[in-house]
Amino acid sequence: MLLNAKPYVEAKMKELKERLSELDVTPKLAIIQVEGNQASDKYVGNKKKKCAELGIPVELYYFSKDVDSHTIEEKIAELNSNDEVTGILIQLPLPKHLDEQFLINQICPYKDVDGLTWYNIGRLSQGIYAIPPCTPKGVIELMDFYDISLEGKDVLIINDSNLVGKPLA
C-alpha cells in the first residue's frame, strides 16, 4: 500500500498555522548542524522552508566537521538559557568523534523538538506524555488521516534508530 502524504501535509500545515496564530509567543527553532553530510544539508533546508511557511524563525548554527564536543555543549547551554528559543534540534548524524546521545541530552527536555533526550524517550516508553520523535508521530498521524488501524496487525519495521525505528515500534 502506498500512501500519498501531500493531502495530510497540507491539512497539517493549515492546522499548525491556526494553532500558531493562537499563541502568545512566537516559537523559534535553533538548529545545530555539523558539516560533512549532504543529506543533512537537504533536511535542514526542508526544515527551514517549512518553518518559514509557518512564520517560525530559525537560527542555524553550522559548525566545521572538526568541531569539538565542548563547543557544541556551550552553544546548547546558551540556547537552553535563551527564552526566545523555544526549540532546539541537533541535525543527525554527527561525525564519529562526537557523542550524539551525550550532546542531545544537553538539550532541555522541553526544548527537545526531536524527542531524543533520555528524559523524553524514558517518559514515552512508560506511556507518560513526552515530546515524541517527529517522524514516528508523522507516520502514526498519516495512518490516522487515512483511517488505517494497525491494532491487531503484524507490522515489520526495518529500522532500529532512536529517531525512527525504536519509537515507531
Residue spans for each PLM region:
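Helix-enriched interaction subdomains in cytosolic or periplasmic regions
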Residues: 1-7, 82, 98-105
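Positively charged, low-complexity intrinsically disordered leader regions
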Residues: 1-25
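Short beta-strand segments enriched in small/hydrophobic residues
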Residues: 26-36
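Glycine-rich phosphate/diphosphate-binding loop of Rossmann-like nucleotide-binding domains
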Residues: 34-48, 133-169
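Short beta-strand elements in bilobed, periplasmic/extracellular small-molecule ligand-binding domains
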Residues: 51-66
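Non-catalytic terminal and connector segments of soluble metabolic enzymes
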Residues: 53, 78-80, 107-110
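Short, well-structured alpha-helical segments in soluble
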Residues: 71-82
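Anion-binding alpha/beta catalytic cores of soluble intermediary-metabolism enzymes, centered on
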Residues: 90-155
